[in-house]
């Protein structure tokens, strides 16, 4: 693939030209363009009058000298109206059953069929062959058809368990469209003077026949990396477990992979990336219920697994747990240990400070910070006499939080290991230690593991930053992925500061 970045830029400019004058239809235009460039079919679902036919007409201008055919199906439509009338001359002179296909579907590159589900069996059967094999049987001859894009539209879904399901399964991309929602866009649409049927695409951007044929071969050379396949298989396995998930045929999965290859190719990449998998949200649904379910499952895949977000959080959890174990071990070694006094028959156990603790004011460090009296506290200052009296007789004990202000009332106790423990309002405790006896900073083992984890996070974030330059993926999906990665990064940095 020569100059992939130039190709990606050209396709982006081509799409922008096709989108001119169409409001809130950028995603539909881009996916229809991707389908046309890879030879796939699209189904547009939505009420009348929302530019479904205009989208198909616009796609004709993506190609040089492309021919278009469009038809509104009714229950009374005949094959002659779609595939061309019979040649009376050929039948009369030579007895040949042959259609005159000029100006009809068999000779069109871009095809739009409205109210598709109203087509009769004779049309549907021929249409299936045209979609599957890009062939049309004309009398005794089988002719190749040049169709690059079939856009079918309706304001309803096909009935379940009907003869229409086979055709519905051939339509790889399925888009649910609605009226223009944004106020400014609605106003612009009402006041626009642009002729919707004008060609908005400069000649230099239009795709030639030679380019189209060459690209079809190059799309097939785009690789599917192992880690991307694992994500696809994970999604498939998850859908198989859900009772309400739609049935997805092997044929649909295979055709979807080619669409992902095309997305990578026209984004200037040589391999399918996790970001391309977002396109599956427009390929795997069947009805309104499954549309929401598919989007939810792909959202979980993208924000939890595609860039190892969940894996990194699992590693972080293990590191934090190990840090807590080391802190507990350190706490047991460095904590201030008071001396238990005799007095078996006294109502309250009595203690005293070690003989080597002689300062009139004691500053004791918390093994882990606590929030006390709305303040983040890392050390507490006690008057020696007040602390000795509390150890001997109990009652109220006060200390200066972080050594400042007035002495505040504290929830202090002596644990079974004869260590002083201060607790916050939620009864979370922190062991107290003398200055110099508490380890400072993170242990080397924990620091190294966190640095390695942060390095892996930076690699994943860099990969996403490179891959997100994809014309065919909506920005809101990219925003959610970025937020998920930033959340992981914030948790790693928070752990490094502990």
Swiss-Prot record:
Q: Which residues bind ADP?
A: 23, 49-54, 196
Superkingdom to which the source organism belongs: Bacteria
Q: What class of enzyme is it?
A: hydrolase
| Reaction(s) this enzyme catalyzes, per UniProt | ATP + H2O = ADP + phosphate + H(+)
Subcellular location per the Swiss-Prot or TrEMBL entry: Cytoplasm
Q: Name the InterPro entries for this protein.
A: AAA+_ATPase, ATPase_RavA, ATPase_RavA_C, MoxR, P-loop_NTPase, RavA-like_AAA_lid, RavA_ATPases, RavA_LARA_dom
Recorded family membership: Belongs to the RavA family.
Spell out the protein name for this chain: Regulatory ATPase RavA
Organism of provenance = Escherichia coli O139:H28 (strain E24377A / ETEC)
């Amino acid at each position: 693939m020569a100059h992939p970045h130039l190709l990606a830029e050209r396709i982006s400019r081509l799409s922008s030209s096709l989108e001119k004058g169409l409001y809130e239809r950028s995603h539909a235009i881009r996916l229809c363009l991707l389908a046309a460039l890879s030879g796939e079919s699209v189904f547009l679902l939505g009420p009348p009058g929302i530019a479904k036919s205009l989208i198909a007409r616009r796609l004709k201008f993506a190609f040089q000298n492309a021919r278009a055919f469009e038809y509104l199906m009714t229950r009374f439509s005949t094959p002659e109206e779609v595939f061309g009338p019979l040649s009376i001359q050929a039948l009369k002179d030579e007895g040949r059953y042959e259609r005159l296909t000029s100006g009809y579907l068999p000779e069109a590159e871009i095809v739009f069929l409205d109210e598709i589900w109203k087509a009769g069996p004779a049309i549907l059967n021929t249409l299936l062959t045209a979609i599957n094999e890009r062939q049309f049987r004309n009398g005794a001859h089988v002719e190749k058809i040049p169709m690059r894009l079939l856009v079918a539209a309706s304001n309803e879904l096909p009935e379940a368990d009907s003869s229409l399901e086979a055709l519905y399964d051939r339509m790889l991309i399925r888009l649910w469209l609605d009226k223009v929602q944004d106020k400014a866009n609605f106003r612009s649409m009402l006041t626009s003077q642009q002729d919707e049927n004008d060609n908005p695409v400069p000649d230099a951007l239009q795709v030639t026949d030679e380019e189209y044929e060459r690209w079809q071969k190059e799309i097939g050379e785009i690789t599917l990396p192992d880690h991307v396949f694992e994500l696809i298989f994970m999604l498939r396995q998850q859908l198989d477990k859900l009772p309400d998930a739609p049935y997805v045929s092997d044929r649909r999965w295979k055709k979807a992979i080619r669409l992902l290859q095309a997305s990578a190719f026209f984004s200037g990449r040589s391999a399918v990336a996790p970001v391309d998998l977002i396109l599956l949200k427009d390929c795997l649904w069947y009805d309104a219920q499954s549309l929401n379910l598919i989007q939810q499952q792909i959202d979980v895949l993208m924000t939890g697994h595609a860039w190892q977000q969940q894996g990194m959080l699992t590693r972080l959890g293990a590191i934090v747990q190990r840090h807590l174990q080391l802190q507990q071990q350190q706490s047991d070694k460095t904590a201030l240990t008071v001396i238990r006094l005799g007095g078996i028959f006294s109502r309250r156990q009595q203690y005293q400070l070690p003989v080597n603790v002689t300062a009139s004011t004691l500053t004791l460090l918390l093994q882990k910070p606590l929030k006390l009296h709305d303040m983040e506290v890392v050390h507490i200052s006690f008057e020696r006499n007040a602390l000795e009296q509390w150890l001997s007789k109990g009652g109220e004990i006060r200390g200066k939080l972080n050594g400042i202000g007035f002495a505040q009332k504290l929830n202090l106790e002596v644990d079974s290991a004869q260590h002083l423990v201060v607790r916050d309002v939620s009864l979370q405790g922190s062991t107290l230690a003398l200055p110099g006896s508490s380890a400072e900073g993170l242990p080397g083992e924990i620091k190294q593991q966190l640095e390695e984890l942060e390095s892996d996070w930076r690699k994943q974030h860099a990969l996403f930053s490179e891959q997100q330059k994809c014309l065919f993926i909506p920005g809101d999906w990219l925003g959610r992925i970025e937020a998920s990665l930033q959340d992981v990064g914030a948790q790693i940095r928070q752990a490094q500061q502990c």
